[in-house]
């Protein structure tokens, strides 16, 4: 267990059985666990968690590590407390988020330094991303649906990384009235969450949050860490959604959350 660091949107709940790490019989066991789930979010969520919706580029005046030929669209970067540049250029957001969650006890600047390209943790994130993607392909071949295979592969990788995903995922739709409930959950002191962002254009992206002492930090592998007082998380999320909308032209439609226990 890892310690936490020192517009409205209804939810429909997806409850998943815990996934166990793969061994010689692990793929069959994992697939069996997946088949026990009563409802899949696949009708709502594209099967692209490993394909990040946005990769930072270089000319955005709000952020030297991101680019846009258009006007600055959001105040997102005024919330940033630690920058991460170019770490996600190859679309390894799931692996990078796993490594960030494993390193929460470190200082923010150390966490970011540990994830820069060429570092040991960045290399580890690349390996974890590949493990996740390979297992997802295997589970699809075994008959699992896109969403089931994605969730099982993700959680197997997280467990192999020494993390403890709850095995229960909740789905929240942008523009519906229950999104504040999600914000309340991810800002509960002492909690860590894995979040998947799904976009109307078909892309998806993985981020994470950690809450402690009335503050919540959001880690986005494309940009770094953003920290706000927990009662300001709505503003941060709105700014994040705006940043992906303009200049990246990715419109957030759905957020799924899973608590890391």
UniProtKB/Swiss-Prot annotation:
Active site annotation, chain numbering: 93, 205, 220
Catalytic EC class: hydrolase
EC number: 3.4.22.-
Gene Ontology MF term list: cysteine-type endopeptidase activity
Polar residues bias (residue ranges): 1-15
Biological role stated in the UniProt entry: Potential cysteine protease, which may play a central role after invasion of host cell.
Signal peptide bounds: none
Name recorded for this polypeptide: Putative cysteine protease YopT-like y4zC
InterPro entries on file: Papain-like_cys_pep_sf, Peptidase_C58_Yopt
One annotated GO biological process: proteolysis
Family that this chain belongs to: Belongs to the peptidase C58 family.
Source species, domain of life: Bacteria
Annotated region described as Disordered, given as residue ranges: 1-48, 54-73
Biased composition (Low complexity): 61-73
UniProt keyword Thylakoid, yes or no: no
Keywords, alphabetical: Hydrolase, Plasmid, Protease, Thiol protease
